[in-house]
Regions:
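C-terminal, flexible cofactor-proximal segment of oxidoreductases
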Residues: 199, 203-273
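Conserved beta-strand segments of alpha/beta enzyme cores
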Residues: 25, 83, 113-115, 177, ...
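A Rossmann-like FAD-binding core segment of flavoenzymes
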Residues: 76-165
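N-terminal Rossmann-like NAD(P) cofactor-binding module of classical short-chain dehydrogenase/reductase
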Residues: 10-11, 149
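Glycine-rich dinucleotide-binding loop and its adjacent helix/turn
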Residues: 11-74
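FAD-site-proximal beta/loop scaffold in flavoenzymes
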Residues: 28-51, 142-205
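Rossmann-like dinucleotide-binding core of oxidoreductases
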Residues: 53-104, 197-210, 219-223, 229
Length: 273
């Protein structure tokens, strides 16, 4: 053990990826970060058992949904007859977003013949079979799956509570020289606490400024008031669903893709300062 003296401490430990046991024919987000998607998918499509080709995507959050539609588009380009399905533990997809996201996405899945298994838990993979369990009855299900791709989301540790200035609270008392930012924090303020890059970056910039202010002009700290700018989930290269400005104004299709570019441009500007 070692003790370090500090003037200010910033905790920004974030969230961990949910980890599942790796098995044959199973991929996750890290695999796609390390290799091109086509390199990962083509071995399945080039197999001789055309009638048995099937891909299972596990996880109906934003990442899983965006990969699901990109994979469907890739299969269409390759004129593949491989079947595609989504496994999700919840009743609806994109449950963290406003109502309307789920119905639009699920209607597009139906149009594209993507099978949907809601309220279903992933148990594992054995060779070319995915092992599932029905959420309410615990009934075990086995389906053919030549490739299973896991997008299990983030696992948030017990978050640190903070006041509106980003100072950690212990028994409702702020620690003046210890700040927290990112996904591991919940601010007691009107600002957004969603687990998104937007919120994490804005909290980080705020506490950086507040540390400088506190070290020079005690008491003149800035509160965290930033709302979400918007959020767009892409559904392939020609479709999307999202909102910007107000959560009640749902936008779909090509206009939503345009908004996605605007939101990402705003995020890039935010990172640039």
């Amino acid at each position: 053990d070692e003790s370090l003296h500090f003037d200010y401490l910033l905790v920004a430990s974030g969230c961990e990826n949910r980890i599942s046991d790796r098995a044959e024919n199973v991929l996750n987000l890290q695999d796609f970060a390390a290799s091109a998607g086509s390199e990962l998918l083509m071995p399945l499509l080039e197999s001789n058992h055309q009638s048995e080709q099937s891909i299972s995507v596990v996880g109906g959050g934003a990442t899983g949904i965006q990969f699901l539609f990109e994979i469907k588009q890739f299969l269409s380009r390759k004129k593949s007859k491989a079947t595609l399905r989504l496994i999700h533990s919840g009743e609806q997809v994109l449950e963290q977003f406003p109502r309307g996201f789920d119905t639009y996405v699920q209607s597009r899945m139906q149009e594209l013949n993507i099978a949907f298994y809601p309220n279903t838990y992933y148990r594992g993979q054995q060779s070319n079979t995915i092992l599932l369990a029905e959420k309410h009855t615990q009934k075990h299900i086995e389906l053919s799956s030549g490739l299973t791709i896991l997008f299990l989301g983030k696992s948030q540790r017990t978050p640190y509570a903070a006041n509106a200035f980003g100072q950690i609270l212990i028994d409702q008392t702020p620690l003046p020289n210890i700040f927290v930012a990112g996904d591991c924090s919940v601010y007691r303020s009107v600002g957004s606490n969603t687990l998104t890059a937007q919120s994490a970056v804005r909290k980080g910039k705020l506490v950086a400024h507040n540390i400088l202010r506190h070290s020079g002009l005690p008491g003149l700290l800035e509160p965290y008031l930033h709302p979400d700018l918007g959020y767009v989930v892409s559904l392939g290269s020609a479709d999307a669903v999202g909102w910007i400005g107000t959560e009640n104004a749902l936008i779909t299709g090509l206009p939503a893709l345009t908004l996605k570019e605007l939101v990402e441009a705003q995020y890039d500007l935010l990172l640039a300062g």
